[in-house]
Amino acid sequence: MFPFVPLSLYVAKKLFRARGFRFCQKPGVLALAPEVDPCSIQHEVTGAETPHEELQYLRQLREILCRGSDRLDRTGIGTLSLFGMQARYSLRDHFPLLTTKRVFWRGVVQELLWFLKGSTDSRELSRTGVKIWDKNGSREFLAGRGLAHRREGDLGPVYGFQWRHFGAAYVDADADYTGQGFDQLSYIVDLIKNNPHDRRIIMCAWNPADLSLMALPPCHLLCQFYVADGELSCQLYQRSGDMGLGVPFNIASYSLLTYMLAHVTGLRPGEFIHTLGDAHIYKTHIEPLRLQLTRTPRPFPRLEILRSVSSMEEFTPDDFRLVDYCPHPTIRMEMAV
């Protein structure tokens, strides 16, 4: 709903065109779209050239902008959304860190290591200089979730807790959960090593009994691993994908997780398959993503693991080196909270 008295269609069109939008007529729907129609932007591949895998992401953006359903959402900002999308990224010769904008690589590494520790304290991650969970751990946000009794930074039984202590009774972010619950991470490492053809090599963060205790229920909620020909591949199911900010981060995070698991189990990284449920673009991100769609992908970087480690707990941020990452400049987008 617009917070003003309805105007004639003619006047409304003039107002919105002045703000850089145009009206696109769809069957039964009058939708706003950017003045530069993203549907017209194409990234051509000529000859026998192998298409750049980042084009999958750009096509997803374009498809959502062109055909997305206009939906209300938890944040009140509003989104354009499509249901059910998939992309596949090879991990064999490169690492799928998007290049049409700079992705916060240090944040990807620090957040994943924080998950792997089982931590639920956003202040711990913030002390590393990665503040992506600060707003969700704020007093205001926790109170809005009915969690005003929690101290600032206590996110509840979110990703890391479910990965390392699934089923344990959550007390707070400061409690010691050693030996409590089911350690899914250790379980999948054991399966990959000892029963690699098992079809249950799954790690899941979606625990319905704990959802009301979480500052934010998991968006990327289930990953399954698959071993074939000495390679480890991963498929992620993500119920909710913020295409502007979250999805580029998630692609890198689960690709990194696959590299790490392959390293400790003596395998090679194979492929990352990313399956999205509600794939959406926040309306505040439309303009930045229009800019991103005008950019041509550059070669993906390579990822090197610099020392031999035998367990997931041994990894540190200094163990990873990104080689030849030359992205386009950063594109600023505000996080929807």
Swiss-Prot record:
Pathway membership, UniProt: Pyrimidine metabolism; dTTP biosynthesis
Keyword Transferase set for record: yes
InterPro entries attached to this UniProt entry: Thymidate_synth/dCMP_Mease (IPR045097), Thymidate_synth/dCMP_Mease_dom (IPR023451), Thymidate_synth/dCMP_Mease_sf (IPR036926), Thymidylate_synthase (IPR000398), Thymidylate_synthase_AS (IPR020940)
Any GO molecular function: thymidylate synthase activity
Highest taxon in the source lineage: Viruses
Enzyme's top EC category: transferase
Catalytic activity line of the entry: dUMP + (6R)-5,10-methylene-5,6,7,8-tetrahydrofolate = 7,8-dihydrofolate + dTMP
Residue numbers binding dUMP: R74, R199, R200, R239, S240, G241, D242, N250, H280, I281, Y282
UniProt-listed Enzyme Commission number(s): 2.1.1.45
Key words of the record: Methyltransferase, Nucleotide biosynthesis, Transferase
Biological-process GO terms, alphabetical: dTMP biosynthetic process; dTTP biosynthetic process; methylation
Residues holding (6R)-5,10-methylene-5,6,7,8-tetrahydrofolate: D242, A336
Family note: Belongs to the thymidylate synthase family.
Family matches, as HAMAP family: Thymidy_synth_bact
Annotated protein name in UniProt: Thymidylate synthase
Source species of the chain: Human herpesvirus 8 type P (isolate GK18)
The organism's taxonomic lineage, starting at the top: Viruses, Duplodnaviria, Heunggongvirae, Peploviricota, Herviviricetes
Gene of this entry: 70
